Structure formats: C-alpha cells, structure tokens
C-alpha cells in the first residue's frame, strides 16, 4: 500500500480514514477466523485428521472433495474399494506429502500412488499396457463379483471412528435387482 500524503487533509478526515481502515481490518480478521474455524471442523471429518500433520487449506479442500467422491461412488456401486483403489481416489490432485500420509494411513506403498513418469515408456517394453500402480479406466471399485445376491459394502473408513462402520443394505428382491443394474452401469474412473 502506498503512503498517503496527509498534509492536504484535515485531522478529522485523517481520523475517519484510520477508523474505516481499523474496522475493515477487523472485519477481514473475523472473516479469516470464521474460515479457519470451518476448515478446522472439516479436518475432523476427512481421513487425515488433526492427529496427523495439519493440512493446508487447499489440501484440506481437495481431500474433502476426493473423500466425498469416494463415499459417493461406494454408495452408487454398493462395493467397497480395495485400500489401493481407495488411496488412488483420495490422493487425486494432492501433494506428494499428503499422498504419502494417505498411503501410510491406508497401509499401501506410496510408490503405488505415484503417476507413471514419462520415462517409464522408454524403460518398459510393454509401455502400451497400463502402469501397474493405476487401475484400469472405467473399472468399478472392486472387480470381484458379489458372492451372494445381497452384497453391499461391509465397511467404510470413518476418521471419527477408529474402527470401520458397517454399511446397511437390503436383501429384498427390488433392492437386489437395482443393485445389480447399478453395479454394472456405474463405473469408477481414475484420473492419473
């Protein structure tokens, strides 16, 4: 901010400007406190909680978006992802540090979450195949077919509850028909 030449202003005008600036600063400070409090509350519900390293604002929002996406896909497909599939979903667009924390939390190797480098093409003669760390595009969370006619996901990760929480499903025939239709229509797309 440029210094203002105050020699042309009356003392009353200078005083009014200072008061307005102090009020504006107070409003901005209150707005930032509200935003920070909301982000702290959000951090309690995402997989990397405050028990771990505190995430930046943007990492918190990205992880929350990915977590919502993962939960939504679990509900749509009615399947529980493998830890690696779940980690891929959560790590989408996150920094390497956050990705490493997720890998540790979900007990997968961090290198399995790395996108394939452009040099993999030259070192791997089967470069036309998918990189082993990435699931095939348009695959569902789980490639295994249901063992029974009523097989909703058994558990999902809840950061506020250390143990997994059971998901509910229905074994009524209408539910089974709807489940089987949706499990073949809804697929999970991964973005490398």
From Swiss-Prot:
The encoding gene: cnd-1
InterPro entries: bHLH_dom (IPR011598), bHLH_transcription_factors (IPR050359), HLH_DNA-bd_sf (IPR036638), NeuroD_DUF (IPR022575)
Organism (species): Caenorhabditis elegans
Biological classification of the source: Eukaryota, Metazoa, Ecdysozoa, Nematoda, Chromadorea
Localization: Nucleus
PROSITE patterns, per database record: BHLH
Protein name: Neurogenic differentiation factor 1
Tissue expression as described in the entry: Expressed in neuroblasts of the AB lineage. More specifically in precursors of the embryonic ventral cord motor neurons. Expressed to a lesser degree in the EMS lineage which generates mostly endoderm and mesoderm tissues.
One cellular-component annotation, GO: nucleus
A Pfam match: HLH
Function field: Acts as a transcriptional regulator whose activity is required for several aspects of motor neuron fate specification, including cell division patterns, proper spatiotemporal expression of fate-specific markers, and normal axonal morphology and pathfinding. Involved in regulating glial specification.
Any single GO BP term: axon development
Boundaries of every bHLH domain copy: 19-71
Knockout or disruption consequences: Defects in axonal morphology and synaptic connectivity of the ventral cord motor neurons.
């Amino acid at each position: 901010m440029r210094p203002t030449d105050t020699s042309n202003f009356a003392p009353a005008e200078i005083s009014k400007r200072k008061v307005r600036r102090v009020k504006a600063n107070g409003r901005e400070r209150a707005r930032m406190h509200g935003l920070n409090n909301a982000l702290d509350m959000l951090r309690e519900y995402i997989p990397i909680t405050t028990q771990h390293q505190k995430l930046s604002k943007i990492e918190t929002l990205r992880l929350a978006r990915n977590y919502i996406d993962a939960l939504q896909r679990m509900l749509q497909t009615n399947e529980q992802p493998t830890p690696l599939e779940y980690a891929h979903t959560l790590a989408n667009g996150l920094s390497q540090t956050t990705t490493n924390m997720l890998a540790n939390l979900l007990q997968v190797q961090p290198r399995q979450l790395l996108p394939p480098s452009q040099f993999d093409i030259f070192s791997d003669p089967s470069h036309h195949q998918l990189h082993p760390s990435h699931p095939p595009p348009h695959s569902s969370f789980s490639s295994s077919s249901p063992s029974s006619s009523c097989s909703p996901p058994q558990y999902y990760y809840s950061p506020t509850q250390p143990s997994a929480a059971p998901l509910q499903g229905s074994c009524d025939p209408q539910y089974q028909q709807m489940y089987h239709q949706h499990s073949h229509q809804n697929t999970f797309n991964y973005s490398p």
